[in-house]
A protein has these predicted regions:
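Short acidic-glycine-tyrosine-enriched beta hairpin
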Residues: 73-90
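A short hydrophobic beta-strand segment most commonly corresponding to one strand
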Residues: 38, 86, 100-119
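Asparagine-centered strand-capping/turn motif at beta-strand->loop junctions
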Residues: 96-98
Length: 138
């Protein structure tokens, strides 16, 4: 099935990513009314974000492609359409696309009154290679 975007492709992320990613803020919640942000992120093949934490946690709703999620010190989890990832507050993690496939998710950052993401070091090429392990993406 060809990729049929649900939301328009967002702006290219300028920082905190290795590779090309596009972010469309669906619910920026600038006023704080909802105490959460909702965003659509498209990762081009091989793209991943830096290690980071969220003071209020994060939820990922995987909508297209093949991706990976990894918590610091844990094995990576392969993600595909329909997967849901619940990330507790302050858990250091990264997520991104498979080496040869794009990946899209809806991200939800709850409890935004606690603050935004804390961005840490980039995921190294070695960490990424070990996490994705040349897996077959069928």
């Amino acid at each position: 099935m060809p990729n049929q975007e649900v939301f328009p492709k967002g702006s290219q992320a300028a920082a905190n990513f290795t590779g090309a990613a596009f972010v469309n803020m669906l619910v920026p919640d600038v006023s704080g009314t909802y105490n959460c942000q909702v965003y659509d992120v498209i990762f081009e093949p091989g793209c991943r974000n830096d290690w980071h934490t969220h003071p209020g946690g994060q939820i990922l709703l995987c909508t297209d492609g093949i991706g990976y999620y990894q918590e610091k010190g844990q094995p990576a989890r392969r993600l595909q359409r329909g997967d849901v990832v619940e990330i507790p507050p302050q858990v250091e993690h990264w997520h991104g696309a498979a080496p040869d496939r794009s990946f899209t998710h809806i991200g939800i950052s709850p409890n935004t009154r606690k603050g935004g993401a804390t961005w840490l070091l980039p995921v190294t090429d070695e960490e990424y290679k070990q996490a994705t392990g040349g897996n077959n993406h069928v």
